[in-house]
From Swiss-Prot:
It comes from the Bacteria. This is Imidazoleglycerol-phosphate dehydratase. Keywords: Amino-acid biosynthesis, Cytoplasm, Histidine biosynthesis, Lyase. PANTHER family: IMIDAZOLEGLYCEROL-PHOSPHATE DEHYDRATASE (PTHR23133:SF2), IMIDAZOLEGLYCEROL-PHOSPHATE DEHYDRATASE HIS7 (PTHR23133).
Length: 197
């Protein structure tokens, strides 16, 4: 089996981002982004998706977290698009429900080649620590646009904002794991009746 890994580097006047991923990893994460709460959430993707992540970002954090969060999402999306390759033999779809105490979230993903985000998370607070939770919309939009996936994110219940966000990221990791899994019955076959994605 060919290695499903990718390295992507993205440099702008606002951020310099490097992302390495291994879709068939063990859930290891090495994160140096400068935004601790985002790092905590990305660690959930690695751990629950069994995807190795190595992400380094130098951003204009003296302004705010916006460019860093968005550009990490963009670059991670580019890395996923590269790592899945032609998608032959891949499950393609993934979904997960994850609870954390009172919170429950559902994430559904399709590596369709068509970007689309539906995100419905009624945050109960605007900020967790120093982190503006609205930036997670920017993260996921950047990811979707560059991974070329359809992504549906729903927080079904919860009143602790940290729990709401954490269930989203854990479910996202688990949905990714399911979607990128290789099915030996589909070896060499495209997971679409169109013959391409």
């Amino acid at each position: 089996m060919a290695e499903r890994t990718a390295f992507v580097e993205r440099n702008t006047l606002e951020t310099q981002v490097k992302v390495s991923i291994n879709l068939d990893g063990t859930g290891k994460a090495k994160l140096d982004i400068g935004v601790p709460f985002l790092e905590h959430m990305l660690d959930q993707i690695a751990r629950h998706g069994l995807i190795d992540l190595d992400i380094e970002c130098k951003g204009d954090l003296h302004i705010d977290d916006h460019h860093t969060v968005e550009d990490v999402g963009i670059t991670l999306g580019q890395a996923f698009a590269k790592a899945v390759g032609d998608k032959k033999g891949m499950t393609r779809y993934g979904h997960s429900y994850v609870p954390l105490d009172e919170a429950l979230s559902r994430v559904v993903i399709d590596f369709s080649g068509r970007p689309g985000l539906q995100m419905h998370v009624p945050f109960t607070r605007a900020v967790v620590g120093n982190f503006d939770v609205d930036l997670f919309q920017e993260f996921f939009q950047g990811f979707v646009n560059h991974a070329l996936v359809s992504l549906h994110i729903d927080n079904l219940r919860g009143h602790n904002t940290h729990h709401q966000i954490e269930t989203v990221f854990k479910a996202f990791g688990r949905a990714l794991r399911m979607a990128v899994e290789l099915d030996p019955r589909m070896a060499g076959q495209m997971p679409s009746t169109k013959g391409c994605l």
